[in-house]
Amino acid sequence: MSLRKIIHVDCDCFYAAIEMRDDPRLAGRPMAVGGSPDHRGVIATCNYEARAYGVRSAMSSRHALKLCPDLLIVKPRFEAYREASREIHGIFRDYTELIEPLSLDEAYLDVSDSQWYSGSATRIAEDIRRRVARTLHITVSAGVAPNKFLAKIASDWRKPNGLFVITPAEVEAFVAALPVARLHGVGKVTADKLTRLGIETCLELREWSRLALVREFGSFGERLWGLARGIDERAVHNDSRRQSVSVENTYDTDLPDLASCLARLPELLDSLNERIARMDNSYRPDKPFVKVKFHDFSQTTMEQAGAGRDLESYRQLLGQAFARGSKPVRLLGVGVRLRDLRGAHEQLELFPPK
C-alpha cells in the first residue's frame, strides 16, 4: 500500500474556546459550557482552568460545582459552534477534499495527494493551525501520521495548541512503548482484561499470536493484533460533496468603512477565480455570495440567485451585507455556491431507461 499522510485536527476545549473568544471576561477563570445544575445538567466541555480542578466533559454540572465552587457554567450556543466549525472546514478544504468529520471540533484529513508545501503534511498541519488561530482566534491541536489510529493519538500528545508528528520510520518504536489503554477501541473493560493478562504495552501485546488474541477477544483480537504493530488501513471517508468555494481574509487592522471593504474586493475575486479554475468539471458555479465579519465577531452573509460573478455584482452584495452592520470589518469573504453535476447525474441514473 502506498504511503499515506493523515492529519487529525482537534480543537482545544472548542465550545469553551468560542465562549471565551466572544466574551473575554470568561478567560482566565474556571468556566464550562453545559446545562443547569438545578435541572440535572451535564458539562459539555470546560476550559483548562476548570480541568485543573478535575472538571470533565459528561460530568454532572452539580458534581462539577462541588469540585470547583467558583465554576461559571454558561449555556451552549450551538449555532455559534456550527458556524465556527464551518469556517474551520473551509480552511481544511483548501488542502484536500478528503475530510472525515468526527464532530464539530474534530476531523481527519487525508493529504496524501495534496500539492501544498510540496506535499509536506507537517507544513500543511502547521498552516492549518496558524490560519485557524488567526481567523477564528481559537487554538487547535494536530497529529500527523501514516494512518488514522496514530494521527489521533498524535493530536492528543501535545495538547493544548500543539503539533506532534509520527513519521513512518518512527512508527515501530513509538507503538512499542504505547500503553494498550491508548489503543483505538480499548475501553475500560478491555483494558482491565489486558492488564489481568499481563499486557500493559503494545510491545507486550505483540508477544501474543493473532489466533490467541482472537480466542481471548473475539473479532476485536484481530484488530488488536494490527494496532499493536501500528497497522490501520481504515480510509478517510468523505461522505459529502462540496457545496461552495470561497476565499476569506482576516485583516490585521479593521476596515473602517464600506469604501475600504470595496477596495479589497478585486484581490479577493482574483483568488476566488484561481480556486474555481482548479476545480474539476463535476461542479458548476451557481449563486455568488459575500461574507462580512464585523469587529465584534457578529457576521452576515449575502447571496443572490441569478447574479453574475463579475466585480460589480460582488460590489452590490458587499454593499448590502455591510449595511446590515455598518461598523468596522475584520474579515471579508467572497464565494460561490456550487451545483453538483455528478450528484445530479447519479440521481438520474437511479431510473435507467427501460
From Swiss-Prot:
GO terms for biological process: DNA-templated DNA replication; error-prone translesion synthesis; SOS response. It is an enzyme of class 2 (transferase). One of its GO terms (cellular component) is cytosol. Keywords: Cytoplasm, DNA damage, DNA repair, DNA replication, DNA-binding, DNA-directed DNA polymerase, Magnesium, Metal-binding, Mutator protein, Nucleotidyltransferase, Transferase. The keyword Secreted does not apply. Its cofactor is Mg(2+). The active site is at 106. It is found in: Cytoplasm. Its EC number is 2.7.7.7. It catalyses: DNA(n) + a 2'-deoxyribonucleoside 5'-triphosphate = DNA(n+1) + diphosphate. InterPro entries: DNA/RNA_pol_sf (IPR043502), DNA_pol_Y-fam_lit_finger_sf (IPR036775), DNA_pol_Y-fam_little_finger (IPR017961), DNA_polymerase-Y (IPR050116), DNApol_IV (IPR022880), IMS_HHH_1 (IPR053848), Rev_trsase/Diguanyl_cyclase (IPR043128), UmuC (IPR001126). Residues 6-187 form the UmuC domain. SUPFAM superfamilies: DNA/RNA polymerases (SSF56672), Lesion bypass DNA polymerase (Y-family), little finger domain (SSF100879). One of its GO terms (molecular function) is DNA-directed DNA polymerase activity. The record marks 15 as: Substrate discrimination. The keyword Hydrolase does not apply. Mg(2+) binds at residues 10, 105. It comes from the Bacteria. Binds 2 magnesium ions per subunit. Monomer. Belongs to the DNA polymerase type-Y family. NCBIfam families: PRK02406.1. Poorly processive, error-prone DNA polymerase involved in untargeted mutagenesis. Copies undamaged DNA at stalled replication forks, which arise in vivo from mismatched or misaligned primer ends. These misaligned primers can be extended by PolIV. Exhibits no 3'-5' exonuclease (proofreading) activity. May be involved in translesional synthesis, in conjunction with the beta clamp from PolIII. This is DNA polymerase IV.
